Amino acid sequence: MSDAMQDKRHDPRVPLIAAVEVIEVATGTRLSARTSDLSRSGCYIDTLNPTPSKTVVRVRLTHLSEELELPGRVVYTSPGLGMGIRFDENLTPAQASVLDRWLLGTK
């Protein structure tokens, strides 16, 4: 990943493997994959067929038998490797609580 992309991050990402389903809002197309890292503001998803950059998505994460769905957008892709997702900034307190619990559990 480039230094420029790293500089744009507001929250540190931590290694976290979770099942994920990415749903394209415009088409309903679904992609099942897994995350390799997670933060309060986004995640990286390992997939051979990343969704195009700028696509608006819903991200359904499952970790520790708990499910969380967040709105977001694909911010970059690495063909054959994966894609970076930025979550919408307006997380509900419940969504933020789940993310924080998962992130703290990885330390």
Region annotations inferred by a language model:
Residues 1-107:
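Structured alpha-helical
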